[in-house]
Amino acid sequence: MGIKGEETYVNDIKRIVTDDKEKFYNYMNLKLTGLICEEPDWLANLSNASALLWLLLDEINWAGFYLYKNGELVLGPFQGKPACTHIAIGNGVCGTAARDLETQVVKDVHLFPGHIACDAASQSEIVVPIVHEGKLMGVLDIDSPIKERFDEADAKGLQKFVDTLNKYMDWSKIV
């Protein structure tokens, strides 16, 4: 990789500055593929995925995963402040996304019935369910201290992020 005599680092990921969300998410998914495509360990992959989100997404205060285990969501790899460790299916934004198997774009978390406040600074949230071969594996959860931070373009881009995870992850090692 790289030019002879130059060192290339796996963590040499540059931030991209663009107003084009499709271009941004395509770039981020390319970087995710590079990080996880040859790594079989699920913990390493989800850890790097959450670190990548933390590095590249602006105006967020939490990014990570909850994994579906024993009928509930259990905290997985993340970046940000310590978080709730268990979430019941149907509770809060994460539990709702898991129950309905639908992405939740919440422009103001204070208006979401039953919102679970792990960080008082959070104002908006997006949660994408991770479904593999028809089964719930968990959710991708991202919080922002900015109201209306997330929109449908983010939902589409983050769904592709989850699709990339599904392409390379061996979920059988987790559940």
Name these PLM-found stretches.
Residues 2-77, 164-175:
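Intrinsically disordered, low-complexity terminal regulatory regions
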Residues 60, 68-118:
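Regulatory sensory and allosteric helical modules in signal-transduction proteins
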Residues 62, 127, 139:
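Short hydrophobic/aromatic beta-strand element in the GNAT-like acyltransferase core
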Residues 124-131:
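A short, aliphatic-rich beta-strand micro-motif
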Residues 131-144:
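Sensory-domain boundary capping and coupling elements
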Residues 146-148:
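A generic structural motif
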Residues 150-168:
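Amphipathic alpha-helical "output/dimerization" segments
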